[in-house]
């Protein structure tokens, strides 16, 4: 892996990340393909939208179809038909979202949400699975506490995250993939600082900010991000896990973050909402019924070049899956174009102006006509 910061504007930065399956320009948004697919979209759709990297989920793939099936195909890239870089998460976030966990320093024991069988996941198993998947970027196994956890619970999770990070690094025996460490610490400044110092002391290829944007106040999200970034090395990529709205991405880029992922754009598309350069657009609303406009006049995606708001409103109104497909394609295309403009504004020294304009647009309540 190679990472080079090419340009800065304040703390915002443009970089180039070279990975085994291709080059990724940062800041970058990564569409989420939980089960080795971005919902409703083909790899060709993603490529035409300009996606340079996607995220897939170790936890779900480990359970179904299982590592052996993916290994049979020659790895995750061939299994899902995607030739560009892939980042896999470690499974920690999903595991700690499940009820009735047994957690100790060895790992986590839980019931499979698929068939109820007992499953054990540890740093070593997570690394083994991710290496077998063959993703470009793997994530260390971490303990992500709930957003309402008290100080002592978060402190214990932070210490365990450090111990598990050491074991993840030790178990990561491959030269063809890279490993990112994850900083935890909840919403407690001293624990965020402590975790950042601990994780960076191990030495990873990149660093992720975990355990945020999971229900806490936005002001706390930004404060904890600032504290964390202060202790991360300048020459390594910084990844905010789970940040996906345009407004949040702008705030995080302004604080020095490089990489983002979220199901947000495709999830809201499936519920009839489009992201546009004028804000959110509700395609369920009746005012679209007679509109011959595209979803976004500034967008060049397949959806906007070929279909009207009226048609997509009709599809959504009738429950036709094509409406969800077309909006998913548009929203992913928008996010890729949005990140293009983020990078351009940093390169031109106009990022703060761009950020202010877009936050005003997205805080105004969205498009109504």
UniProtKB/Swiss-Prot annotation:
- Pathway, per Swiss-Prot/TrEMBL? tRNA modification; tRNA-queuosine biosynthesis
MF terms (GO), sorted A to Z? metal ion binding; tRNA-guanosine(34) queuine transglycosylase activity
Binding of substrate occurs at: 89-93, 142, 184, 211
From what superkingdom does this record's organism come? Bacteria
Q: Name one GO biological process term.
A: tRNA wobble guanine modification
Q: Name one GO cellular component term.
A: cytosol
Known cofactor(s): Zn(2+)
Q: What class of enzyme is it?
A: transferase
Cofactor descriptive note: Binds 1 zinc ion per subunit.
Which family does the record claim for this protein? Belongs to the queuine tRNA-ribosyltransferase family.
The protein in question is named: Queuine tRNA-ribosyltransferase
Protein's gene: tgt
